[in-house]
């Protein structure tokens, strides 16, 4: 539907897979998200056994090699099927993945939430990274690791984007955006307009405090 709307408006359709992953929060009591009927039955059919009970996202994925292969495969198959379906009607449609680096910074999440065979620069036009936790924790060193992460996945600077969460002036979101701009990405995106308006920022945004001194 989105590709159709964009095409009707005279645009080249551009579709995002927004945070397509296995979400897990250790403090909300929901447990691991792998055990719905479809996932468990598909795993059983493929491997002839029940999926291992995984209790934490800090587990070493090498100890569960079949699950570590199967789970990202489902994500990759899902996005690949959508790409094929949409491009059958809109062959010039462009696709990007929004990938949150911070919430995947655990041994298991790094493996199961990035299907390396499918999420490549050959299949996607852009990889967009984000890391709101690093921004809100005021850690520019970690924000930089998020900004740079796409290179390790094989995406050139022109094939990458970075999403920055707008926050109050005590966080370093503007500095993070300027750092990302320095890498020559396709885009640096500020999220979101409602935050921008509620806080009351004005345009143009600050380019940072700079001083120059000439001593002749």
Regions found by a protein language model. Give the residues of each.
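Loop/turn elements at helix/coil->beta-strand transitions in domains of secreted/extracellular proteins
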Residues: 9-13, 90-95, 155-158, 184-187
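Polysaccharide-binding and catalytic clefts of secreted carbohydrate-active enzymes
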Residues: 1-89, 101, 109-114
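Alpha-helical structural signal in soluble globular domains
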Residues: 5, 81-89, 114-123, 148-149, ...
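Substrate-binding cleft of secreted/luminal carbohydrate-active enzymes
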Residues: 124-216
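A residue-identity detector for tryptophan
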Residues: 22-23, 119, 173, 214
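A short acidic (Asp/Glu
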Residues: 25-30, 106-113, 138-141, 173, ...
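Generic detector of short, locally flexible boundary/turn motifs and exposed helical patches
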Residues: 59-64, 94, 154-155
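Substrate-binding cleft/loops of secretory-pathway carbohydrate-active enzymes
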Residues: 16, 88-136
């Amino acid at each position: 539907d989105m590709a159709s709307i964009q095409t009707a408006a005279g645009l080249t359709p551009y579709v995002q897979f927004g945070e397509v992953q296995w979400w897990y929060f250790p403090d909300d009591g929901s447990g691991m998200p792998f055990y719905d009927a479809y996932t468990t039955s598909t795993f059983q059919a493929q491997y002839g056994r029940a999926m291992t009970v995984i209790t934490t996202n800090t587990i070493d994925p090498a100890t569960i090699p079949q699950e570590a292969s199967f789970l990202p495969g489902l994500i990759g198959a899902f996005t690949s099927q959508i790409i094929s379906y949409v491009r059958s009607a809109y062959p010039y449609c462009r696709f990007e993945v929004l990938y949150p680096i911070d919430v995947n910074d655990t041994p298991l999440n790094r493996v199961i939430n990035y299907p390396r065979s499918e999420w490549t620069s050959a299949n996607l036009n852009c990889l967009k990274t984000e890391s709101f936790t690093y921004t809100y924790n005021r850690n520019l060193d970690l924000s930089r690791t998020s900004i740079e992460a796409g290179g390790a996945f094989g995406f050139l600077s022109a094939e990458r984007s970075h999403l920055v969460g707008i926050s109050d002036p005590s966080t370093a979101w503007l500095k993070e955006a300027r750092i990302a701009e320095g890498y020559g990405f396709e885009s640096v995106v500020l999220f979101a307009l409602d935050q921008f308006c509620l806080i009351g920022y004005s345009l143009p945004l600050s380019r940072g405090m700079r001083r120059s001194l000439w001593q002749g």
